Regions:
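Membrane-interface helix-boundary motifs at transmembrane edges
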Residues: 35-48, 71-76, 104-114, 165-176
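Alpha-helical transmembrane segments
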Residues: 11-19, 73-92
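Juxtamembrane boundary at the C-terminal end of a transmembrane helix
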Residues: 186-196
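Hydrophobic transmembrane alpha-helical segments in integral membrane proteins
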Residues: 1-25, 195-196
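Membrane-proximal helix-loop-helix units in multi-pass membrane proteins
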Residues: 83-153
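Central hydrophobic cores of alpha-helical transmembrane segments
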Residues: 51-52, 173-185
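A generic, lipid-embedded transmembrane alpha helix
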Residues: 47-70
């Protein structure tokens, strides 16, 4: 009997581990939103912050769904497993930055977000690179599904992250989160058809 697990045995294990990390990120976002509803006057709300929370919630769900393509992976290594868990952790960190434990030292969520934007957009820029590596790991069949828009998202996303990292202008940040959300909706509509 061969004690080495098969790819079919490793995939569910990895999906559980990644799902746990993603679930923690979703929990943080939902708890912050619930806290806003429970105590509406405790901290100042922000459209910018809420849009990023919504965008990241969608990002976590998309990540969880996209990772299902790993079932086609024939060879698993510890490096691949570590990479995938690391990628999930970066998404959790983004959720943690959007759902701080205490913002008493700040003038609401937007003030906190803009003052912590360098951390947020540095990690977000990193996720664009991680997503590219993740797509390459999944291989040819997965990669063939994409058109030019997938390959444009990385340089455009990186430029937008650099702008957001550098400037605290609210209008710029609203435009960037708007572009990010539109791209997420495009991906959702284009790739997630449930018929057939």
């Amino acid at each position: 009997m061969d004690p080495t697990p098969t790819a079919a045995e490793i995939f569910p294990h990895m999906r559980v581990v990644m799902g746990t990390v993603v679930g923690l990120g979703i929990t943080r976002l939902l708890m912050t939103f619930a806290g806003m509803i429970q105590h509406p006057h405790r901290n100042r709300w922000s459209t910018l912050h809420l849009l990023w929370m919504g965008s990241l919630l969608l990002e976590l769900i998309l990540f969880w769904w996209w990772e299902f393509a790993l079932f086609r992976l024939e060879f698993w290594t510890f490096g691949v497993a570590l990479f995938l868990i690391g990628y999930a952790i970066t998404l959790f960190l983004l959720a943690a930055l959007l759902s701080p434990d205490n913002i008493a030292d700040y003038d609401g969520y937007e003030d906190f977000f803009l003052k912590r934007r360098r951390w947020f957009f540095s990690i977000l820029a990193g996720t664009f690179v991680l997503d590219t590596v993740d797509t390459l790991i999944k291989g040819g069949r997965h990669l063939e599904r994409f058109d030019w828009s997938y390959f444009v998202q990385v340089p455009v996303g990186m430029v937008l992250c650099v702008l957001a990292w550098r400037y605290a202008d609210r209008r710029l940040h609203l435009a960037i989160v708007g572009i990010h959300l539109l791209h997420q909706f495009y991906l959702t509509i284009r790739f997630f058809t449930f018929a057939g």
